[in-house]
Amino acid sequence: MIFSDTVRYALIALAYLALNRDRLVKVEEIAKVHKIPRPFLAKVMHELSKRGVVYSVKGPRGGFSLAKEPDKITIWDIIELFGDAYKYEMCLLMPHKCSEFADNPCIVHHKWEELKSQIQDFFKGTTIKDLINIEEKHLFPVSR
């Protein structure tokens, strides 16, 4: 499973803000550094602001900053915020939620349930702080 562009861009932007906590950061800067379409990123940032994940300051000296500590924002929080959690509840073989047919599961149901639970636990236990700690080891390029 991969993240939607919306979730991916949100995670990149949040990690970038966490690495630049001493100042307000403009959407244009994040978009340029990470080659993200500015209009798309602006919508993502607006939603993060509406939901209280980031602060937004308007004006020529404005920009964005984190509204929460990086260790208080999980990957799962962002997945849920953008409505992508359903992807992690879907059957691998059928176009429905696994739970909808629990009495007649598909052939990979039990293995998938186990793995799906591990994936969700990983996302719920991984924070923006974890992502920037990885960045400091040069494995997650959010500051370049």
From Swiss-Prot:
State one Pfam family annotation.
Answer: Rrf2
Gene3D superfamilies, per the entry: Winged helix-like DNA-binding domain superfamily/Winged helix DNA-binding domain (1.10.10.10)
GO CC annotation, single: cytosol
GO molecular function terms listed in the Swiss-Prot or TrEMBL record: DNA binding; DNA-binding transcription factor activity
DNA-binding in keyword set: yes
Sorted keywords for this record are:
DNA-binding
> Domain HTH rrf2-type spans what residues?
2-133
Which Gene Ontology BP terms does the record give? regulation of DNA-templated transcription
Q: PANTHER family under this entry?
A: HTH-TYPE TRANSCRIPTIONAL REGULATOR AQ_268-RELATED (PTHR33221:SF14), WINGED HELIX-TURN-HELIX TRANSCRIPTIONAL REGULATOR, RRF2 FAMILY (PTHR33221)
Q: Which NCBIfam families match?
A: rrf2_super
Return the protein name: Putative HTH-type transcriptional regulator aq_268
